[in-house]
UniProtKB/Swiss-Prot annotation:
The keyword Ribonucleoprotein applies. It comes from Drosophila melanogaster. Pfam families: Ribosomal_S19e (PF01090). One of its GO terms (biological process) is cytoplasmic translation. GO terms for cellular component: cytosolic small ribosomal subunit. GO terms for molecular function: RNA binding; structural constituent of ribosome. Gene3D superfamilies: Winged helix-like DNA-binding domain superfamily/Winged helix DNA-binding domain. This is Small ribosomal subunit protein eS19B. The keyword Calcium does not apply. Coiled coil: none annotated.
Amino acid sequence: MPGVTVKEIDQHVLTKNMAAFLKKSGKIFVPEQAVYMKTGKFKETAPTDDDWFYTRCASIMRHLYLRSPAGVGAFTKVYSGRKRNGVRPSKHCRSSDGCIRKALQALEAANMVERHPDGGRKLTPQGQRNLDRIANKIVAKQRERSAPVSMIITT
């Protein structure tokens, strides 16, 4: 299965599998305040998923694979949303840069992401290798089961 890249895999399946890999590897340090963090000021509550930090890290890695280099400001735009103001009109609002910064710092500590000299961050060869390896596993499972890619989750 050489030649299979992240671009050819369903993003939801890849993100779930990468998050499971990051959690299983134990290299990602989840900050203590992650339990109380909201992912943006447009959100009303903190995430209900206990593993949301791993999912966010996996999503950031996928984004860096496709569009690198990117900084914290770019990710606040990517994860932005609509702030509901009650009876007043809704407005566009950027996401929290604190949780993005913590995720990038955790990925840097795990040697998956590094700083780019022109600004922002990019994937390391190890991070790119991990993403490609997981994409190949997903395709192998798909061919083995002959199931659609969206139905496959490897752990």
